[in-house]
Structures are given as C-alpha cells and as structure tokens.
Swiss-Prot record:
PANTHER family: 1-PHOSPHOFRUCTOKINASE, 1-PHOSPHOFRUCTOKINASE-RELATED
Organism listed in the record: Staphylococcus epidermidis (strain ATCC 35984 / DSM 28319 / BCRC 17069 / CCUG 31568 / BM 3577 / RP62A)
A GO molecular function held by the record: phosphofructokinase activity
Name the UniProt record assigns to this protein: Tagatose-6-phosphate kinase
EC number: 2.7.1.144
Amino acid sequence: MILTLTLNPSVDISYPLDQFNLDTVNRVSQTSKTAGGKGLNVTRVLSEFGEDVIASGFLGGALGQYIEEQIETTRIKQAFFKIKGETRNCIAILHEGQQTEILEKGPTIELKESEEFKSHLLKLFKETDVAVMSGSLPKGLNTDYYADIVRLAKEQGILTILDSSGQSLEEVLISNVKPTVIKPNIDELSQLLNYKVTNDIKELKAAVSQPIFNDIEWIIVSLGSEGAFAKHNQKFYKVNIPNIKVVNPVGSGDSTVAGIASGLIHQQTDEELLKKANAFGMLNAMEQQTGHINTDKFDEIFKQIEVIEV
C-alpha cells in the first residue's frame, strides 16, 4: 500500500474574475472549493490509476471536516489525525490571465499532537510499502519532523519519497537516515547547493553528486518543458518528453511524485519508473483540474518519452 502524508492541507478556494479591483467589492459568479494540499494531489492521481493508496495528515475544525467529506465522495481511503486547531484556507483569485494567491499559515500543532501522530503513523506503517511526504510543515512542528518520519519508516522497511523544500528538506539531508527519493526542481537544487545550477548535463551530474546527497537512492530533478534529469545509485539519466498542449501545469509535480510511488511499489525498471513519473506529470498538465490525469491517454504519452543513460 502507498501512504500519502499531507501535514498542512487546505481547503483550496478559486475565485475567477474578469477584472480584480482593489479597495472595492468584487462579486464572483462561480466558486470552486477542493480538498487541497500536495499530498492529496498525489493521492487522487494514484487512486485514478488504480493504486492501493491511503491519505493521512493533520485535520481540524469545520474545514478539516469539509476535507474529510470531500475525500469520502471519491471513495479514497483516509486515516487523518484530528487536531484542536483549524485547517486552513488557501484562496486563488484568477484575474486577467494572472493568479493572486492568499495563503493562510494554518494551525499550530501542539507537542502532544505531534508525538501522538507518530504513534498513529506506526499503526499505518504496518500495511505500508511506500510513504510519500509532500508539502510544507505546519506551525508547531520542528523543522526536522520529516527527518523523524523518514527514520521511523526506514526502521519498518518502508520506501520513502520526500517532496518538500527549504529547511525541512535540508534537515532530512543532514540527518543520518535518508529518504529513498527526493524530487527537487532546478531552482530548489540551486537553493540547496547555494549556487546556480543550469540544465547542462555535466553541471547536473556534478550537482547531484555533491556529498549532501550521499545515500539517497533516487534524485529526480524536474527540468520543466525539457523533461527531467535523474540519478539512481551510480547511474545518471536524461528524460526527454514530447511537446504537449499545456492546459494547467499546477499539480504536475505532485502527479510526477505519484508516478514515482507507483513505479517503486511495482518494482519497475529505472526506465519504466522515469517514463511513468513524467507521463503522470504531463497528463496532469493536459487537464484543467489539478491533481487529475486521463488514464486513457497514459500509454500514448508513455511511449513518446525517451530515457537515455548519460
């Protein structure tokens, strides 16, 4: 089973406007509300592809209940941990071809809740083969909280995928127990190394071979429209992708993570895993809805992706 963790989920609200006027009333004719968070995008895509997946994380208050109810309608398994705080809203105002976002920080997790959640995870780990950790940490959690989860998972023989950035990712990289997979984009890779990394293959090889990445089995670097670059143990790969009509790229990284998780749990070859991961990301970008793929188009896209050992 694949376990997805969304520790700072949200109710994502979208307000489309022809024009956004400051300091006055803006009336919205259509509103969309969805259960949001990077891990939930991963969950939905895995479920659409038919994988055995369960979603967990922190939920609280009326908004947390709304997320639970939304997930129930999709029949996706869930095992969220209830907290005293209120789950957050994230608002996107879509106007004149632009997107203005208002993101709440979310609840503060109490120390007791953070410790009890680890016990909650240990129960879920009994049936877990792959654990996916996505997104930011809520307030109240130590920056090394993901590192703690990776350690607990590894003790149970579980493969782990971490899709995070900033200090929470850095804490994992300096810990003595490493995740199976990390998936930085080129900007996040540059931030970790404190120098600008380009798409040049030699530069990418040197970058992912830095000591900070020692003992991480898979490093998969998204290169946007240029595909991806990957290191698996001592092998390096360049992934070339076909041109597609991009409808909505939001959530494509999360969909790529879903493909990685699917590849891991089925013990697929390096080429198959990388092609599946990139196909999932592209299929998401071809759809209007975030965290959604048209599985009928999977084979067509999969066949067009090229993986070259470099």
